[in-house]
Amino acid sequence: MATHSNRGRAALVALTLTLLATGAAAPARARDGDSSTVEVRRGTNLAVSLSPDGSTLLMDLQGVLWKLPATGGEGERVTGDLDDPALPSWAPDGERVTLQSYRDGTYDVWTMRPDGGDKRQVTAGPYDDREPVYSPDGTRIAFSSDRGGSYDVWVLELASGRLQRWTDSAAEESQPTWSPDGTEIAFVVGRAPDDPDRAIGELTRLTSRTIEASDERGARRVVVTESAGTIASPSWGPEGDEIAYVVTAPNRSVLKLSGREVTRDEDVFPFRPQWRSATELVYAADGQIRRRDLAGGGAAEIPFSVRLDVTRPAYEQKDRAEDDRRPRPVRGIVSPVLSPDGEQVAFVALGDLWELRIDAAPRQITHDRAVESDPAWSPDGRRLAYSSDREGSSNLYIRDVRSGATRRVTSAPGAEVAAAFSPDGRTLAYQDEQDATFALDLATGESRPLVPAAWEPGAPTWGPGGETVAVAALRPYSNRFREGTSQILAVDAASGEQSWVAPIPFASLSNRVTSGPVWSPDGRAMAFVIASRLWVMDVDAEGRPTGPPRRLTDEVAESPSWGRGSRELLYQSNGRLRIVPAAGGAPRTVPVDLSWRPARAPGRQVIHAGALWDGVRRQLRHDVDIVLRGERIVRVHRHRGGEHGPDVVDASDLTVIPGLWDNHVHQELYRSFLGARQGAQQLAFGVTTTVGVGDPAYQALEDREALAAGRRVGPRFLASGEPVDGSRVYYDFMRPASDQAELERELGRIGALDYDILKTYVRLPYAFQAQAIDFGHRRGLPSFSHYWYPPVAFGQDGISHITATQRLGFSRTQSPGGFAYEDVIRTASASKMAMMSTLFSATTLLADHPELLEDPRVRVLYTPSQLEELQQLAEDARGSEAAAARVGLERSVGILREILRSGGTVLAGTDLPLEPIGVHLHLNLRAMVRYGFTPFEALQTATRIPARQFGASGDLGTVRPGRLADLAFVEGDPLARIEDAANVRMVMTNGRLRTVPSLLAPFADG
């Protein structure tokens, strides 16, 4: 067996073992909240495993294993909420069961008794081991693993612990099943097409249409080939002549037997069919367990019932002090960089660029509406490079520090960001919107490629002599699952030759945004952040380590930069700037005397509205006055006339509605590309509040402060920092927490930086997720993730998608056919855990609304790349896959509708900026109405309901006295015609009115 030091996971293992010792099947309870149980008789993507004697079933439903008679009955829980088990398989003697479990922070193979007792971990380490199955003689377990650089089939000999690799190819081989005589293993083969344009770290979609079999010597043969769809979960029959499996396709799944269809019009779940005999299968479909006679006798239901624990969270949400006008210290300091002489710091805050002389007051360098980013000093400290969209798109500028003279050095229609001077100061490295890295010759203005496009790489840093460039880049473990570790990629600037550097084996940089690497000016060392602490490592001119990494801090650290030659490092720690000697020693704080004050609205205003939807009633009120004092509404009454003057807003031909919420945004993801346009795009479509569910923290804080201070135009922003992830990551801003100490540092950082929302991500184990939820609630922060159960038992506040990326590779909230069953609907109703709409396929409605592509708000405010993407989406909406996408959209909306009408919580959201900004929120609302919501119900998911969900119902979401004046002014009646909600003509945020023409004007000339 491969071995690996697990010191990093010791705390998590100790926690789970303690829980197991006190009762393995006990659910993890939330600290606070109203706990109850819900009985369910239908499950979403449930799986079953039949005992060898045919008497007992183990059912995997919502991440819990349940034992029940094979004839049906009440399920007995045999695993706990923190076990995170899946895909159980019986030993041939029926005495033990093997399964995959994530409770150690990676997928490992475990065994246990069928009643859940005597759990034993049989594989361990940094790799994922999945889909275990006993050999027919019970002496071995086959499983799939990424320990070889791609998924292969491995076999564990239980007596000796010896591991043997049965497959070894570049393909992804998984989901093994033994032949009845134990001489062969069949498995699914996933192949990725060659893609020369694939970015570094980016996956290519697998095609899994083949089942092959291999013997112990590696002799392989093709067993089954399908012409379409995706094969899942083969199961070799008892006589060796048949293999059962499931084929999935958009909105459809079917059980097949060696090429022929066994089911029709069933929502078959994609798990291993169970052979009751050579002529009978047990499987799960349509929320049920079924027994099917293969001789043509049809299928019979095996009834079951289980009780799921749910918790409705009860805590006081954070007070956002909307009426507090006192000065507040700036927390959002972005990209601080120390000057070469160590005397100054350049940074971005409150929407502008600043310079700070150590122990002096900051000095504002820019004073404009543009978004500045990524300051970088020249090696001699006389010039400062940065990005700004002051002339329409984000380009590179260089400022002479002494004179203040500034010149633009790039002018491409796209964005150029992340500047870094070469050691001789003659070249700027930078990155474009496609995440490729270039070198700009400052004398000639010519650019040349340095590093090919990578998946969300870090900023470039130069090695000595400008011969090597390094970036942080993602290195996935396989092509089957997208996650990997953020490592250092060093690239020869002349030849393009690439080499990977992992400073600590299997450890990830703390993100690819603020964790380095940063090469020292003398070229002898790199600084970087791992486990949220600052490290330095000696390297050669190519970036190869010449010594072990040295930890410089025990406190949280990020955004390192070098100064005083290579003798000091500046970094950020929980809102403070700190400087530490590169040789080690005590850090010192750099004071930043900078504050901001919330912007004030005009004194008294009267809005004469032709019609009003207040967010509560099911019909409009007509001819209404809305009276404001400052930011708040003081009266709403029938229009009285006689009001004239500059404090009167004439909306007599418009309908006033509460400003819309987009409850799923990553607002900083493309901010440096989109610049000031992004806020205007949102406001122009009536969005007055956005809810961040994952962003680089300091960028999010800067944005929140700049917006609240009136220094940037855009919606009110509930900000979150980076999601807390597990030992593997995907997006550049995810922060891994692979042990208890790392988790505690991350949670401490969240508390220090004053988040509004807490997000956990795909690879964080449930033991850590439960701690994060509890931590957030004790600080008034709602918690969101991609996972439904057991987080619904932990008191989690919501999920950001109906279904999205899962570490399992499948969803427990939506089936292959696009349905959710009683387990999801009833727990949603009982817990009130919110589900965000995030209807990606709503873009298929662009085929019905071509006018959106010609809307002036789109034509003027979108960048060329945004317009190109929108046009491609519109073409796809008329393409060959559009019909299937609409079926999937209808079924997804059906889930949301059923949750809402059963008393659950639905929030409208878009996953901005991954979908067309502004436009996509309205496509979500239109999709809801098209497939069964009333306009009133749809609008409430973007107004009153989110205000209640995020503790703001006393301030936002309705048009009532005492509420803040966040309003949209639209033509038409959106309660009768949901499309009218997009006919925005004016918008008001915090009592400040803007017309759509005023939002377009700064960008009218491109």
Spans of model-derived segments:
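A flexible loop/linker signature enriched in serine peptidases of the S9 family
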Residues: 42, 60-66, 81-85, 98-110, ...
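Short loop/turn segments that connect beta-strands within beta-propeller blades
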Residues: 69-73, 113-117, 157-161, 215-219, ...
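Histidine-rich, glycine-flanked metal-binding segment
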Residues: 69-75, 618-657
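C-terminal cap of metal-dependent C-N hydrolases
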Residues: 280, 562, 948, 964-1005
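Divalent-metal coordination cores built from histidine and acidic residues
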Residues: 651, 655-656, 660-663, 674-798, ...
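Active-site neighborhoods of metal-dependent hydrolases
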Residues: 746-764, 810-931, 997, 1004-1006
